[in-house]
């Protein structure tokens, strides 16, 4: 689903931070300032947003995985909802150091999480003492909070979508180290350096965050749908050729 400049205006995408907190590297994307607040140039944001969505759509069409990352308070619920809507992995609580760079160890914790979920389902819990069962439930809750969003992510993601590149410095550093492309929302107070697909915009308003996250989720679903259509189309063409061959 395409987004218009009016929708961006209504969501407050153009409101940056106080002028004294700005990053000079964001100068090309700033329109001016009003009441000591930087105003982001939505003409540029819209074009860059569309470029980022095209990239996400293409990646999803090629069976790529995009990891959603948004752990600050106003982003958590939105990131989780939109990632789940499009069946993508997400990190909505704390970014654990090594989540990408030490993925092998993280996978062991994810295996433990899966094993514990099996124990909960197959009645193993009933055979434990009350204290053991309670300890297990607590550990499961803790693991689910940290790793629940990536428990079905078998390999490193092909790209990462980040709300607030300053807040998610750890995630950005790890992705860059591994050469994982980053689609990032960059507000006027942060540097766009190291972000492959920069979307200049407000990273604090929940309306703006919803607009970005919904856009990425929609692009992923569209990309997957496009891939299915191409397969179906290919099958039809092959069938037509086969029929034509038989008739010839």
UniProtKB/Swiss-Prot annotation:
Pfam families: Ribosomal_S2 (PF00318). This is Small ribosomal subunit protein uS2. Belongs to the universal ribosomal protein uS2 family. Transmembrane segments: none annotated. Keywords: Ribonucleoprotein, Ribosomal protein. It comes from Nitrosospira multiformis (strain ATCC 25196 / NCIMB 11849 / C 71). InterPro entries: Ribosomal_uS2 (IPR001865), Ribosomal_uS2_bac/mit/plastid (IPR005706), Ribosomal_uS2_CS (IPR018130), Ribosomal_uS2_flav_dom_sf (IPR023591). GO terms for molecular function: structural constituent of ribosome. The keyword Repeat does not apply. HAMAP family: Ribosomal_uS2_B. The gene is rpsB.
